[in-house]
């Protein structure tokens, strides 16, 4: 590692995505403990990535992007983020088997 630690920015769209996932697991699947564990795992994965946000292969989006997307796999979900200067901006969390082309 290079010792650099990025600032963290979380977009409201990511929060909306995560809230939908948590609601689905909690109310539809009736498993609030699993929803809580997922949130803990997502948070831990994001914090861990703050020290090496650009050390992974960028995700090649079908759209032209000013900043390349990077991914973090957390269970059956993928967290998408970009790096802008010294900031890791977390933008989306999507179900890994979902067609991302319409969303990323």
Where are these regions (language model features)?
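General helical secondary-structure elements
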Residues: 24, 45, 67, 87-88, ...
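Basic/aromatic recognition patch in beta-strand/loop cores that engages polyanionic ligands
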Residues: 52-85
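Basic, Lys/Arg-enriched alpha-helical interface segments
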Residues: 1-65
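Enriched for short, Lys/Arg-rich terminal
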Residues: 29, 74-78, 82-104
């Amino acid at each position: 590692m290079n010792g650099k630690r990025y600032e963290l920015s979380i977009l409201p769209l990511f929060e909306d995505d995560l809230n939908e996932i948590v609601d689905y697991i909690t109310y539809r699947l009736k498993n609030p403990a699993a929803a809580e564990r997922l949130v803990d795992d997502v948070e831990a994965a994001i914090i861990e990535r703050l020290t090496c946000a650009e050390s992974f292969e960028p995700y090649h989006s079908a759209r032209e992007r000013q900043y390349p997307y990077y991914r973090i796999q957390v269970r059956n979900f993928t967290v998408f983020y970009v790096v802008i200067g010294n900031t890791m901006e977390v933008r989306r969390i999507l179900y890994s088997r979902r067609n991302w082309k319409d969303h990323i």
